[in-house]
């Protein structure tokens, strides 16, 4: 296996892990970064599969919580509601992804779409944060979420199908806009990532498994492990951050990064293809 290809897969995994749970669009970063380092895997599953490595970091970080839920389903009211909320929040994006996923990948998976959505999303975060600073959140614990709250977060997640929007950004901001406290919305976004990314990975693997080679599997494993380790670091760091701070720094980062992408395009460093 070529060392340069291995290094690129490792770098892509690190980018995925560090950005998956931040409201800055991991998919957008993978598209742009992959373009910059000229990383083009031989199949369409690499990026979605290494995202599963980052999601595994959430499972590891909250392993006791997930264990309690698994043992409590069918017996414990709190566990039942937790699973129900995840299912409700999962459905909107899953349905829309099945209906329009092919068209979205064909027409919107390019640096221009990413740049536009990064900038728009940055301004949206600024607005949501300003709005929450003026009103006391109605819900301050994940276990207090109602099915209607989960549905609103699920509807917000639909926008994340467009690259550059950010799955975590859309669900966290959607939750905050609905009156959910910042850290609570962040934790539920973490939990929701598990069924969402497991389903997306399974779908893409089943769809493209015929095109897998041993070379592809090796690159995926490298990216997977890198995404898991960096994802674990990101989850811990973000939870500490939102306990004391807000998401405004990420909003400015999105705006600057989006503008930088356009500058890179104008200078010829990246292309829209």
Curated annotation (Swiss-Prot):
Q: Pfam families in the record, alphabetically?
A: BacA (PF02673)
Reaction(s) catalysed by this chain, per the record, are:
di-trans,octa-cis-undecaprenyl diphosphate + H2O = di-trans,octa-cis-undecaprenyl phosphate + phosphate + H(+)
> What is one cellular component GO term in this UniProt entry?
plasma membrane
Give the EC number.
Answer: 3.6.1.27
Q: Where in the cell is it found?
A: Cell inner membrane
GO MF term (any one): undecaprenyl-diphosphatase activity
EC class name: hydrolase
Q: Name one GO biological process term.
A: cell wall organization
* InterPro entries named in the record: UppP (IPR003824)
Keyword terms, alphabetized:
Antibiotic resistance, Cell inner membrane, Cell membrane, Cell shape, Cell wall biogenesis/degradation, Hydrolase, Membrane, Peptidoglycan synthesis, Transmembrane, Transmembrane helix
**Predominant location of this chain?**
membrane
Where would you find the membrane-spanning parts of this chain?
13-35, 45-62, 82-102, 108-128, 186-206, 219-239, 250-270
Topology of this chain in the membrane: Multi-pass membrane protein
Additional comment: Bacitracin is thought to be involved in the inhibition of peptidoglycan synthesis by sequestering undecaprenyl diphosphate, thereby reducing the pool of lipid carrier available.
NCBIfam families the record matches: PRK00281.1-2, PRK00281.1-4, undec_PP_bacA
Return the similarity comment.
Belongs to the UppP family.
Tell me, in a sentence or two, what this protein's role is. Answer: Catalyzes the dephosphorylation of undecaprenyl diphosphate (UPP). Confers resistance to bacitracin.
Q: What is this protein called?
A: Undecaprenyl-diphosphatase
Organism source for this protein?
Neisseria meningitidis serogroup C / serotype 2a (strain ATCC 700532 / DSM 15464 / FAM18)
